[in-house]
């Protein structure tokens, strides 16, 4: 059984135990360390879920791709739109030179961004994960949260429309195929929601993919919850297959969700048991969260040993992927 914590925060976590409910009609086939959200994730951004179907002129597979990887080099894109989402978060839309082109990204993958500060000897390079649809022609969206002393996030927040930024990619993370796993669990902290949402959106867009998804999302404050509207839409549309649980370090008085940290007790309650077949747990967040939940990665190509809460609960290294 899986606990349900309402995205509308109307139901306390302790009262929320039940099985997946009947799914609503689809709208289209289309330890215990605190989660220090402000630390360590200066290189991540998140794109808004604003899928627009590709026009009839050419299917996505036949459209030109902006990012082709390999020895392509850096691609210069113009900032076309800025939307203030909160005092510390902006949505930035970067246009492609060819309005019919798609990004060329796949799930799950990211892009590198680069700029050179005035007077600096070396450029600043950071990875960002767009979550705008991979088949969206003409542009990509990032949602960027600014962090103190985070040179790339500070630069992006200082940009004006018509200024340009260099991108390179795609950088592969975890290749996804429909029904690759029966049930996946996404444990995210702060802007670590980025690749998680990219993956969830891909799953629920594909009518052939019947994967179940459980999200555990930790933040400092309620206003820090990125993509809350988009996550709520997924849960309302696919209640049999998508569940989201929220935990806040500093919740408001009226908060009815999880409080404090992502704990062993919470994960034991909401995650499938380690003995279940074909499950996968994904982790993405700041260093304190990795240390508590799964242990850190050694490098982009070395997942490192599985430690922390997930190891204590009996999950194996093969059942966990660290973004």
UniProtKB/Swiss-Prot annotation:
Q: Which SUPFAM superfamilies match?
A: Ferredoxin reductase-like, C-terminal NADP-linked domain, Riboflavin synthase domain-like
Q: What job does this protein perform?
A: May mediate the reduction of outer membrane cytochrome b5.
Q: Which Gene3D superfamilies match?
A: Nucleotide-binding domain of ferredoxin-NADP reductase (FNR) module, Translation factors
- Ranges of residues in domain FAD-binding FR-type: 72-177
Topological relation to the membrane, as annotated: Single-pass membrane protein
Q: Which GO terms of type biological process are on file?
A: ergosterol biosynthetic process
Q: Give the family per the record.
A: Belongs to the flavoprotein pyridine nucleotide cytochrome reductase family.
Pfam families reported in the protein's UniProt record: FAD_binding_6, NAD_binding_1
From the Swiss-Prot or TrEMBL record, state where the protein is found.
Mitochondrion outer membrane
The record's section on PROSITE patterns has: FAD_FR
Please name the InterPro entries in this protein's record: CBR-like, Cbr1-like_FAD-bd_dom, FAD-bd_FR_type, Flavoprot_Pyr_Nucl_cyt_Rdtase, FNR_nucleotide-bd, OxRdtase_FAD/NAD-bd, Riboflavin_synthase-like_b-brl
Q: What is this protein called?
A: NADH-cytochrome b5 reductase 2
Top-level lineage group = Eukaryota
Keyword Transmembrane helix annotated: yes
For binding FAD, which residues are annotated in this chain's numbering? 180-215
> What GO molecular-function term can you cite, just one?
cytochrome-b5 reductase activity, acting on NAD(P)H
Q: Which reaction does this chain catalyze?
A: 2 Fe(III)-[cytochrome b5] + NADH = 2 Fe(II)-[cytochrome b5] + NAD(+) + H(+)
| EC numbers, comma separated | 1.6.2.2
Keyword annotations: FAD, Flavoprotein, Membrane, Mitochondrion, Mitochondrion outer membrane, NAD, Oxidoreductase, Transmembrane, Transmembrane helix
* Species assigned in the record: Neosartorya fischeri (strain ATCC 1020 / DSM 3700 / CBS 544.65 / FGSC A1164 / JCM 1740 / NRRL 181 / WB 181)
Designated gene of the protein = mcr1
Q: Which cofactor does it need?
A: FAD
